[in-house]
């Protein structure tokens, strides 16, 4: 119980920070944080909640299959909880953050046909643990089928590391790390890269004119 309460506080703090950036439009997005390893349990955002609000029903505990691990409530886990279960079952990740922003949606559409986007030489890449000069990082972009098990299977094919990110085309980004702090850092780094890239392309287009 103590572990659950501590993880709840951690996830609530992350949710608060991301909500202040308006990264949860129209109740979109979902977050989770691991509570126990054996058996695997994690807290995940409840379906349909306004994540800009803070209530005692923001999260619920689920098991390794994404099913509620506790009774006595009518909460349903986020529709995309299956993606989180794949992540925790395949890696040592401890926290997973999924947000919909204009920038990550535009990037995913611009480069969706290439199925990836690569960034190189940006200082912020160091936040992803890559310290060599002119380091580069690639984000895979997967399609966005309406059938969640199909989407989850596509997502599972792209995860192997304990921290990372995947873009879902015209949908959003899922970022993760070993801790809530690391997951948020990864998410922030990629959102910075997306914003920088789009602004640079706009300026280049204006200069060409």
From Swiss-Prot:
It comes from Bacillus subtilis (strain 168). Catalyzes the dehydration of methylthioribulose-1-phosphate (MTRu-1-P) into 2,3-diketo-5-methylthiopentyl-1-phosphate (DK-MTP-1-P). It is an enzyme of class 4 (lyase). The gene is mtnB. This is Methylthioribulose-1-phosphate dehydratase. Keywords: Amino-acid biosynthesis, Lyase, Metal-binding, Methionine biosynthesis, Zinc. Homotetramer. SUPFAM superfamilies: AraD/HMP-PK domain-like. Zn(2+) binds at residues 98, 100.
